[in-house]
């Protein structure tokens, strides 16, 4: 087996990235309209996308596929208006996820869960503007949804909550990975 990415690897990567993103958006879009849910949005994304990601891992046998998925996910998030901070974080946490998966020979269940949890931290990129560019974020939210919505978002996103957002994404990614693994096992035994 060649270590280089082939056309079939890139096709799988593209299909699973789209599946991962669409499933995540199905959760994120309705929840994102309710400001009080924004702090847990990344965690819920990581929970529900654990299913397609674990399915994706059945196809990943080559280094770099998770990194590329992270970059593409960040790019797609940027194109939907959530800022492009997900791209560099997708590259960093995708690479770390790839390294973890490779250290387990792409077969270790524990490394798959840890790799997914680390990979999922790319989602923190969508929160960076809310924490570090507060005035610009408020103006963007106000222009799109009104000043009242913008005020409510900023009220539920104090700077200290970034620690909870990061921890929530990581922990819920573990649960999402377990959910994905359980679904895969149930499909195998049908």
Regions found by a protein language model. Give the residues of each.
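Interfacial aromatic-anchored transmembrane helix boundaries in multi-pass membrane proteins
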Residues: 28-34, 73-101
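Membrane-embedded alpha-helical hairpins and interfacial helices in multi-pass inner-membrane proteins
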Residues: 38, 113-185
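Alpha-helical transmembrane segments in multi-pass membrane proteins
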Residues: 16-20, 45, 49, 53, ...
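Short helix-perturbing small/polar motifs within transmembrane alpha-helices
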Residues: 22, 90-128, 177
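Hydrophobic transmembrane alpha-helices
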Residues: 2-68
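Aromatic-anchored segments of alpha-helical transmembrane domains
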Residues: 17-25, 72-80, 118-128
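Conserved small/polar residues in nucleotide/adenosyl-binding loops
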Residues: 188-190
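Alpha-helical transmembrane segments of integral membrane proteins
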Residues: 7-16, 41, 45, 64-69, ...
């Amino acid at each position: 087996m060649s270590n280089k990415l082939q056309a079939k690897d890139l096709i799988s990567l593209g299909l699973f990235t789209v599946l991962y993103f669409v499933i995540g958006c199905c959760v994120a879009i309705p929840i994102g309209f309710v400001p009080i849910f924004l702090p847990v949005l990344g965690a819920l994304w990581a929970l529900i996308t654990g299913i397609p990601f674990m399915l994706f891992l059945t196809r990943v046998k080559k280094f770099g596929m998770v990194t590329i998925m992270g970059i593409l996910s960040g790019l797609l998030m940027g194109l939907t208006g959530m800022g492009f901070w997900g791209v560099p974080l997708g590259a960093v946490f995708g690479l770390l996820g790839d390294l973890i998966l490779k250290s387990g020979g792409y077969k270790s269940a524990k490394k798959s869960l840890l790799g997914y949890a680390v990979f999922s931290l790319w989602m923190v990129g969508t929160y960076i503007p809310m924490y570090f560019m507060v005035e610009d974020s408020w103006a963007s939210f106000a222009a799109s949804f009104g000043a009242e919505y913008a005020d409510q978002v900023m009220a539920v996103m104090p700077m200290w909550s970034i620690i909870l957002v990061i921890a929530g994404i990581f922990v819920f990614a573990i649960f999402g990975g377990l959910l994905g693994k359980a679904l895969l096992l149930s499909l195998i035994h049908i």
